Amino acid sequence: MIKKLLIAPVRFYQRFISPAFPPSCRFRPTCSNYMIEAIQKHGAKGVLMGLARIFRCHPWSQPGEDPVPDHFSLKRNDTRKQSH
């Protein structure tokens, strides 16, 4: 029940506000979809994860995949392989 209440404003944004603007999210999944998935996985903490993601979504950030991690984290879940 609480998850549905937390997701409702995001769905409202997706349906009524987002279509009025050109796509601008630098990540996959989009920030709004990330927020929904984070809430589904982590409950109320998912809101914090979603807000942290929105703050990372700016013109100077590295675009790409940033899936919701299985464990709570406010950092980017970078799926690119890093070589050492």
Swiss-Prot record:
Name this polypeptide is given: Putative membrane protein insertion efficiency factor
GO cellular component, one term: plasma membrane
Family stated for the protein in its record: Belongs to the UPF0161 family.
Function: Could be involved in insertion of integral membrane proteins into the membrane.
Disordered: annotated segments: 60-84
SMART domains: Haemolytic
Short name of one Pfam family: YidD
Location within or outside the cell: Cell membrane
Extent of Basic and acidic residues compositional bias: 68-84
The organism's taxonomic lineage, starting at the top: Bacteria, Bacillati, Bacillota, Bacilli, Lactobacillales
Protein topology in the membrane: Peripheral membrane protein
Keywords for this protein: Cell membrane, Membrane
